[in-house]
Amino acid sequence: MKVVAFERQQQGTGASRRLRNAGKTTGIVYGGEAAPQKIELDHNALWHALKKEAFHSSILDLEVAGQSQQVLLRDVQYHPFKQLVLHVDFQRVDAKKKLHTKAPLHFLNAEVSPAVKLSSAIVSHVATEIEIECLPADLPEFLEVDLSKIEAGQSLHAKDIALPKGVALVAHVDAENPVIASATVPAGAVSDAAEGETPAA
């Protein structure tokens, strides 16, 4: 995905306000051996790009002053109550170095699972993304989570995800294998089932 930006000459709070009034958003590119680079982007184009999941999870081709570099979106600052992007951070990517980032989770086939079909359970998505490590060339746009075999009362964990080649989960001390989805039967459904099984007097 290509992103066009321009070198930012003006700095400071007043300059940022003037840029916003002109329909621009400030940003910075950092990482690698090059010095951090201050940039500005067209606000409307950026606003629409940020609505796309791939913009947050893919390697982006950022063009500044005719020079292209591969980057990852690392941070976005929004206005507290206006539909306004205040600032964005991009990190340069080295094709030979592994990167840590978060991949979105796409949940599939819950409607055909035993939990839903046999037990009328509700499948909850406990996590919407997960931290991974891989080379830039191996970075997946998203990870699929197959829920077709989940049963009532069961949970799926991070290590249940089928990872593409070259992609590894980043383990954390406090949650090495976190729950990403669970299937629970609503209390009302359990009560109704119990009443249906009560033998007649």
Curated annotation (Swiss-Prot):
Organism: Burkholderia cenocepacia (strain HI2424)
Protein's GO biological process: translation
Gene field: rplY
Record-given protein name: Large ribosomal subunit protein bL25
Annotated function: This is one of the proteins that binds to the 5S RNA in the ribosome where it forms part of the central protuberance.
Keyword Transferase attached: no
Subunit and interaction comment: Part of the 50S ribosomal subunit; part of the 5S rRNA/L5/L18/L25 subcomplex. Contacts the 5S rRNA. Binds to the 5S rRNA independently of L5 and L18.
Cellular component terms (Gene Ontology): cytosolic large ribosomal subunit
SUPFAM superfamilies: Ribosomal protein L25-like
